[in-house]
């Protein structure tokens, strides 16, 4: 009998070893699959725990930042004799309102308000408009909010000098506006001069901070700020 014939007879007559081997392999594959599923579950669980821990740390971090910003604001208000004409609670409420419509968290805005409060001639509604304008400017120019606050604060504090600094940032004042602003300052009507400057800032940058909150990144930032 040829080798081929012998193989045919052996395969046809005795498959018990082959079947045993297949069953064993099937069990091993099944056990391996179960192990993989368990491992995936463990990995997913680890990532879930890691995400929760990370989120908790982020919340605690933001809470600390806000507490420090509020402490700084309170100190400046006290030092300036509440020159801005707004209480700390009124400022925090406004910061919260801005958080609802922009990508700036209230802790960031409160910190910026502390800086703006150091400019004693910026008061009441002018103060609020100046903060909103700083957010718009920072958004358009892609700069830090505090840097924008410093620039606008200095310009509003000394309008006749600040015009030049604002021009460097792309704010265009007509000769008539410049003349009017300087005249108002000379007459002791600084707040009216400030309003003219804020109106021009609105023309240049107005609505940018709110618009930025409308895209996917802005919406995600707003959601994060809400926590």
Task: Specify the residue positions occupied by each region the protein language model found.
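Generic start-of-chain signal for non-secretory N-termini
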Residues: 1-26
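The substrate-binding groove and active-site-proximal loops of carbohydrate-active enzymes
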Residues: 119-123
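Membrane-penetrating hydrophobic segments
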Residues: 22-45
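Small-residue helix-packing and pore-constriction motifs in hydrophobic alpha-helices
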Residues: 8-11, 17, 44-100, 111-118, ...
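Membrane-interacting alpha-helical segments
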Residues: 15, 26, 33, 213, ...
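Arginine/glycine-rich "motif VI" loop of SF2 helicases in the C-terminal RecA-like domain
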Residues: 142
